[in-house]
Regions:
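Active-site-proximal alpha-helix that buttresses catalytic centers in soluble enzyme cores
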Residues: 1-122
Length: 122
């Protein structure tokens, strides 16, 4: 089993926002030592989830972890992502696709907010 990771974001009409997601995916690969990491977007960015799955499969990944890059649980994570992931799993039965839990409430987010607050407030 060869692992691959997808950083899955909403996507934006503002290309710099999509580039930021691509940078996060690249940094995850670099810091984690994961050779197969791709960004994917629900809408307004490329590739979409299926496109990223196919990119990873072409590199040899057979077990793909989709990490939602959304701050809170909403309809896209509750309804859309599971449906899309299931459709892709049904289409490519030789691939194992797992969706990680959302960032929603992760303690690391509090640290990021504290860092921001401390950089502006005494």
């Amino acid at each position: 089993m060869t692992p691959g990771i997808i950083v899955f974001a909403h996507g934006s009409r503002i290309e710099s926002a999509n580039e930021a997601v691509r940078s996060v995916a690249a940094e995850l690969a670099r810091q984690g030592g994961y050779p197969y990491v791709e960004p994917a977007f629900l809408e307004l960015g490329h590739p979409d989830l299926e496109g990223a799955v196919l990119q990873l499969a072409a590199k040899g990944a057979t077990a793909i972890l989709v990490i939602p890059y959304f701050l809170t649980l909403g309809m896209h994570l509750e309804r859309d992502l599971p449906r899309i992931a299931q459709e892709i799993s049904n289409k490519y039965k030789d691939l194992q696709i797992t969706v990680a839990p959302p960032l929603d409430g992760h303690p690391g987010l509090v640290q990021v907010l504290l860092d921001r607050a401390r950089s502006f407030l005494p």
